[in-house]
C-alpha cells in the first residue's frame, strides 16, 4: 500500500489528541519510530504521554484492538507491560484516517543484556507472558511463518529490481538455498502461542525491574521467538545467557528444548524480512533519508555475505541445554 505521513502535521496531531479529552500544554517531541509516528507531549497537569499514530493499512482495527487487549491482559496479571489508555472505554481512536492510541510516558534505563541478574529477571517475566499467551490465543494477529517472512519478501525483492543486476544471480542463489533450509526447519511440530513478537533488548526498559514496551508486532509463533534475541556474543557466551534466561523462564513456563533448533532459522527470517521491509517502505520519505545505503551496490554485497554466513549457521549444530536441564 502506497502511503506516507505527509499530512500528519502538528495541527492534525494536536486535534487528534484533543479528541481524547487531554489538553496539551507543551510542544510535540518526535520519538524514534519508522513504522509508525510517535510523539511525546505533556498535558496541563504536567503529566507526560506518548501518542502513536499507526501506519494506515498495516494492521486492521481488529488486529490493533487484539494487541491492546493482550497488553491489558498482561497488566491484569501484574506483568510490567506498557498498555494504552482507554478513553470512554476505547483504546483505539481515529482522526482524519489516522488510527492512534495514547500511553502514559514511561522512562527507564536501557536493559543490560550482558547483566545475568537482569537477564534472569527478564526470563521470569517472559515465562509469565508466555503463560498468558499460551492460554489466550490470537484470532486476528498474524502468524510467524515462512510465507510472510521469506516467500513474500523474496517476491518483493525480485519484482522491484532492488538488487543490482550484476549481483542478482549471487544474491538470489544464496537466498533460495537459505529459504529451503529454513522451510525445512520450520516444519518442526512445536506449540505456537501468543507472543510479544519483537522482543529485542531495545523493547525492554529497566526501572525497578524490566518493563516491556511496543507490542506492535505481537503474533502467534514458537516461544523461542521471544527469547533468541536476548542472546549475543560467542557461542559459549550465548550458552551461559540461554541457561540464565531459562532458569527464570521455567519458574513459570515449561520450555520445549526442541525449539532451540529454530534460533538460526528465525534469525534468517528476520534478516530477509528486514530487507523487504526497507523496500516496501521506500516511498515513505523517512526511509531514503535514514537508510540511504539501502539501494547501493555495497549494501547488497554485504547482504550476500550475510546470507552466506547465516547459511553456515543454519547448518551448524544448534545450542543445547546445559546438563542440569
Where are these regions (language model features)?
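All-alpha amphipathic helical-bundle segments outside canonical DNA-binding/catalytic cores
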Residues: 141, 257-267
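Active-site activation/catalytic loop segments of kinase-like enzymes and analogous catalytic loops
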Residues: 223-254, 270-286
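ATP-binding pocket architecture of kinase catalytic cores
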Residues: 43-138
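ATP/Mg2+ or Mg2+-diphosphate-binding catalytic cores
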Residues: 276-325
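Active-site acidic catalytic loop and adjacent metal/ATP-binding pocket
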Residues: 35-51, 84, 180-227, 325
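Conserved NTP-binding catalytic cores of kinases and kinase-like/nucleotidyltransferase enzymes
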Residues: 1-86, 320-325
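A cross-family kinase active-site recognition segment
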Residues: 112-169, 190-192, 290-291
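A glycine-centered beta->alpha junction motif in the catalytic cores
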Residues: 56, 100-113, 154-162, 274-290
